[in-house]
């Protein structure tokens, strides 16, 4: 698997909506995945024999317009979450500089360890609200999917989850790639 048509950072400016106010949400089962309150990592692991994190890039970056409340530099981590070697999710995480030195989490040393394992194993990180976004077939996310040999015939969907640690807030965005949506439909009882 190689990603050649784009480069880090892959993210784009996104209009996020509160799930309660979002209109025209996709039908189940994708809707259920978008709104799932627990760890997406755990949910994904339950659908495969081999789960892996492919790092696309990480480093200090200025957030995209409207992406973070402050326009100060944050640590950005972009990965693909793969199930049995197939990319299902593109994830983009924004971590404020003040959280990088917290003793409870070694964000800089995560490597290929899933971020969800860290966040959901620490009581000091409190999951917050979920927001939803829709991506057109000509978005950067769609281009990324196409570079992974995934055909983008329909709009794509993603979610952004807030995590709170003391007075700080970090964001984890998870966008479902076409392979995930197709597999979810097959998994539906």
Swiss-Prot record:
Keywords for the protein's UniProt record, in alphabetical order = Cytoplasm, Lyase, Pyruvate, Ubiquinone biosynthesis
Does Lyase count among this protein's keywords? yes
Cellular component GO terms, alphabetically?
A: cytosol
Q: Can you name one GO molecular function term for this protein?
A: chorismate lyase activity
Q: Where in the cell is it found?
A: Cytoplasm
In this record, what's one Pfam family?
Chor_lyase
Pathway annotation from the record = Cofactor biosynthesis; ubiquinone biosynthesis
Catalysed reaction, written as an equation: chorismate = 4-hydroxybenzoate + pyruvate
* UniProt-listed GO biological process terms: pyruvate biosynthetic process; ubiquinone biosynthetic process
Keyword Zinc carried by entry: no
Q: What is its EC number?
A: 4.1.3.40
The record's Gene3D superfamilies line, in alphabetical order, gives: Chorismate lyase-like
Q: What is its main location?
A: cytoplasm
- The record lists substrate as bound by 77, 115, 174
UniProt cross-references to PANTHER family, sorted A to Z:
CHORISMATE PYRUVATE-LYASE
| UniProt similarity note | Belongs to the UbiC family.
Q: What does this protein do?
A: Removes the pyruvyl group from chorismate, with concomitant aromatization of the ring, to provide 4-hydroxybenzoate (4HB) for the ubiquinone pathway.
Please identify the protein, giving its name as recorded: Probable chorismate pyruvate-lyase
* Organism, scientific name: Shewanella sp. (strain MR-7)
**Gene label:** ubiC
């Amino acid at each position: 698997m190689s990603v050649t048509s784009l480069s880090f950072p892959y993210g784009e400016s996104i209009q996020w909506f509160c799930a309660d106010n979002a209109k025209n949400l996709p039908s189940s089962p994708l809707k259920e995945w978008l709104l799932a309150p627990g760890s997406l990592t755990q949910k994904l692991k339950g659908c495969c024999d081999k789960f892996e994190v492919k790092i696309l890039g990480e480093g200090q970056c200025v957030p995209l317009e409207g992406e973070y409340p402050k326009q100060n530099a944050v640590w950005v981590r972009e990965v693909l979450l793969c199930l049995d070697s197939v990319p299902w999710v593109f994830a983009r995480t924004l971590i404020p500089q003040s959280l990088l030195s917290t003793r409870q989490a070694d964000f800089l040393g995560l490597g290929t360890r899933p971020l969800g394992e860290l966040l959901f194993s620490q009581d000091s990180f409190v999951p917050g609200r979920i927001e939803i976004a829709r991506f057109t077939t000509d978005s950067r996310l769609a281009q990324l999917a196409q570079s992974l040999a995934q055909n983008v015939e329909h709009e794509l969907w993603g979610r952004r989850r807030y995590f709170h640690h003391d007075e700080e807030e970090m964001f984890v965005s998870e966008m479902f790639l076409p392979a995930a949506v197709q597999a979810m439909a097959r998994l539906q009882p």
